[in-house]
């Protein structure tokens, strides 16, 4: 998948590892190697220009 995303509430950036539609969350791998689950409404997809 390898889609970069930004967390609205913290400003952190990471890579989306998994999407869980049933709970409306995504699993993010941050660039420091940690993982976290965030709600869809707290994540912004990065766009390429």
UniProtKB/Swiss-Prot annotation:
Record's protein name: SPbeta prophage-derived uncharacterized protein YorN
């Amino acid at each position: 998948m390898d889609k970069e995303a930004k967390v609205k509430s913290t400003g952190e950036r990471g890579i989306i590892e998994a999407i869980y539609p049933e709970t409306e969350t995504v699993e993010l791998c941050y660039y420091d190697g940690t993982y976290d689950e965030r709600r869809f409404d707290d994540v912004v997809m990065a766009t390429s220009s």
